[in-house]
């Protein structure tokens, strides 16, 4: 059966400040979402992360965000759809320069943090993001949050002529609408390796998850986000890769 592509946010260090264990995670993922300088990263880190992805045969994705270094891109900004379109184009282009220097290309786009969440709530911001992708390269997929009702996003993507990849998360709790539970809520982030792997396998099989109110939730899963922030999360990524390799042999 087709399995979701494993993606991971990477290149999120900045200067001497280190974020994530990119070297340890890269061998186990299919796609690297590389920060483009607005919420994290700098030119040197962007290029080194692209080179690391090339070394391991991993697809490079642009990970654009609101201009919010202090808040790590997790704060919503009052931006118009045109402003979202322009800031995304700017960031995709910056990463593409690093990709060309390392013999590869940007393969998809995954917005970050508050921008990603705002796009899921506001169709006009999503339309702005889609215009950015179309202006840059109409063949690039755009990652969007999987929800319990993906039909409106699918309809807009068909109208605009954009390929959507619906994204799910192995280590996050969901509400009944299929939205991520706020990180401020208890239990929003899973830390137990077995629970993370079990959720990943459930999503890969197309089986229902249990939402935070106990209801069953069906989510489309073209790609699955994993994290490599610490040694425990890296171990979980390795375990998910092993589990997916087992599913591929079934």
From Swiss-Prot:
Keywords: ATP-binding, Hydrolase, Nucleotide-binding. The keyword Nucleotide-binding applies. Transmembrane segments: none annotated. It comes from the Bacteria. The keyword ATP-binding applies. Its EC number is 3.5.2.9. Catalyzes the cleavage of 5-oxoproline to form L-glutamate coupled to the hydrolysis of ATP to ADP and inorganic phosphate. Forms a complex composed of PxpA, PxpB and PxpC. Belongs to the LamB/PxpA family. This is 5-oxoprolinase subunit A. It comes from Chromohalobacter salexigens (strain ATCC BAA-138 / DSM 3043 / CIP 106854 / NCIMB 13768 / 1H11).
